């Protein structure tokens, strides 16, 4: 059996040993998975050779199903973002070759950072032992095994990862996502019913939307401005840009993407949820062949007391992106020198479809550069935030640098433009961004204020450079800058 990549599609050629030729057969199922059309290979029954299986050989029930339960079915289930379900033996058996291949080559589960394991919390990758179990199971004919609890061998866990939330906030009414092919960006306002301030240590989003959500972010708005925009729109939610009054909690980023594993903030790092606040839930939605109802839920887990630690978000970015059509290696650089010492708690890189490579380094005053994050095959569909198990300590004077590489050529299979077009900085997926958010923890209040003042100057500089670049591109477009 052979697999071929043809453009954005994976095709299957099935070899018939009796005819000693390639059958003229190709089965493709086009699925709109997170904005990119891919082909799902449909393996037919009976192509796998029957083998005598040793009694101690790996089986589906005893060995493979637990791996699928833990790592795969969060996406590969009915209504999930995965293009097929893996909830039962027959579904796994018919795709045993594909499962073995993509796990052996670490294509699935998708995990983009390069480096040794156990650097980040909740890493979404298989161990070598798990990969070997799947490979051996396939090699031995993908036996089912026996168990009295076979029907429950794989469980699509629709429950909350951290148990029942202290509070569940739901959209007041579902949004009807019309059938189509163009991505939809929409904000939804969810009033939060708390009678007194609470401290939040964890947030989980349950999409409940049949694979329609590409990713989501949550911001807090106490001004009522987002609520007014929602009321002015006849449909649930509203379009356009995020209101300036809606912000992440200071030092935190609240987001969700398929396959995300939820972890609690470390002790003392909870954030304040005030009364009379609205959640502004921003959704990147993927229409399908039929209308879908979108109505996710937000689960909140409260801490017993107020936060004792106050993180600060350090942002590296470029608003001057201007990528010529056909350029296969457009490089974006930004750097920032820390005025105070910090512990680096988490890192969140962001780019769109033209992004290909990312490297983030830290060079302290002694000159010994260390890599904080490296991604060699960036995929907009699998963006994530990465929380360190052991936060690196970066002394004052450390230079943090980001280097992002973009491919705007026709050879980039994720290029949204055919033929390639000029792409500039902007919020749409067909625009580009280069952003890096670092969740940092200064030693104390004085250091926190010094860091925030320094970052305000950097943010102002970034915006000025962005406006200057926009004026150079189109001097007559004053409306977008007023």
Provide a role label for each language-model segment.
Residues 51-195, 206, 276-282, 287-289:
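Aromatic- and Gly/Pro-enriched helix-to-coil junctions and flexible linker segments
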Residues 151-212, 290-354, 416-456:
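Solvent-exposed, flexible loop/coil segments flanking beta-strands in beta-rich domains
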Residues 346-424:
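Extended, compositionally biased non-globular segments
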Residues 142-144, 286-291, 405-414:
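Short acidic/polar inter-strand loop motif in beta-rich domains
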Residues 200-201, 270-286, 392-405:
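Noncatalytic modules at the cell exterior or secretory-pathway interfaces
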Residues 36-47:
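Bacterial N-terminal signal peptides
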């Amino acid at each position: 059996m052979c697999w071929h990549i043809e453009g954005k599609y994976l095709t299957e050629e099935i070899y018939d040993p009796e005819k000693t030729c390639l059958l003229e057969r190709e089965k493709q199922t086009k699925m709109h998975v997170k904005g990119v059309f891919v082909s799902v290979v449909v393996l037919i029954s009976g192509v796998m050779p029957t083998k005598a299986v040793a009694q101690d050989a790996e089986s589906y029930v005893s060995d493979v199903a637990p791996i699928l339960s833990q790592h795969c079915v969060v996406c590969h289930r009915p209504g999930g973002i995965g293009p097929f379900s893996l909830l039962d033996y027959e579904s796994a058996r018919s795709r045993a070759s594909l499962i073995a291949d993509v796990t052996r080559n670490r294509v699935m589960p998708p995990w983009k950072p390069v480096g040794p394991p156990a650097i980040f919390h909740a890493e979404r990758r298989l161990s070598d032992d798990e990969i070997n179990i799947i490979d051996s199971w396939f090699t031995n004919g993908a036996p089912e095994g026996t168990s009295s609890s076979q029907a429950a061998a794989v469980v699509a866990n629709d429950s909350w990862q951290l148990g029942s939330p202290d509070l569940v906030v739901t959209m007041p009414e579902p949004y009807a996502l019309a059938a189509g092919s163009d991505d939809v960006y929409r904000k939804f306002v969810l009033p939060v019913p708390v009678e007194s301030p609470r401290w939040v240590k964890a947030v989980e989003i349950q999409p409940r939307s049949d694979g329609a959500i590409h990713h989501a972010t949550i911001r807090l708005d106490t001004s009522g401005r987002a609520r007014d925009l929602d009321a002015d729109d006849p449909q649930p939610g509203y379009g356009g840009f995020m209101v300036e009054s809606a912000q992440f909690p200071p030092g935190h980023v609240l987001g969700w993407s398929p396959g995300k594993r939820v972890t609690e903030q470390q002790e003392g790092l909870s954030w304040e949820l005030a009364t009379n606040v609205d959640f502004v839930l921003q959704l990147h939605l993927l229409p399908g062949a039929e209308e879908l109802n979108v109505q996710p839920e937000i689960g909140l887990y409260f801490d017993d007391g107020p936060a004792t630690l106050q993180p600060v978000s350090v942002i590296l970015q470029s608003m001057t992106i201007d990528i010529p059509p056909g350029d296969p290696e457009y490089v974006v650089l930004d750097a920032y020198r820390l005025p105070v010492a910090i512990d680096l708690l988490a890192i969140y890189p962001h780019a769109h479809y033209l992004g290909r490579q990312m490297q983030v380094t830290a060079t302290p005053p002694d000159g010994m550069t260390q890599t904080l994050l490296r991604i060699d095959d960036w995929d907009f569909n699998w963006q994530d935030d990465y929380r360190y198990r052991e936060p690196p300590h970066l002394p004052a004077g450390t230079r943090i640098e980001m280097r992002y590489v973009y491919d705007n050529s026709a050879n980039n299979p994720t290029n949204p433009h055919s033929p390639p077009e000029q792409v500039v900085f902007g919020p749409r997926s067909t625009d580009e961004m280069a952003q890096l958010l670092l969740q940092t923890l200064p030693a104390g209040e004085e250091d926190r204020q010094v860091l925030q003042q320094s970052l305000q100057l950097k943010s102002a500089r970034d915006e000025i450079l962005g406006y200057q670049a926009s004026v150079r591109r189109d001097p007559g477009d004053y409306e977008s800058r007023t």
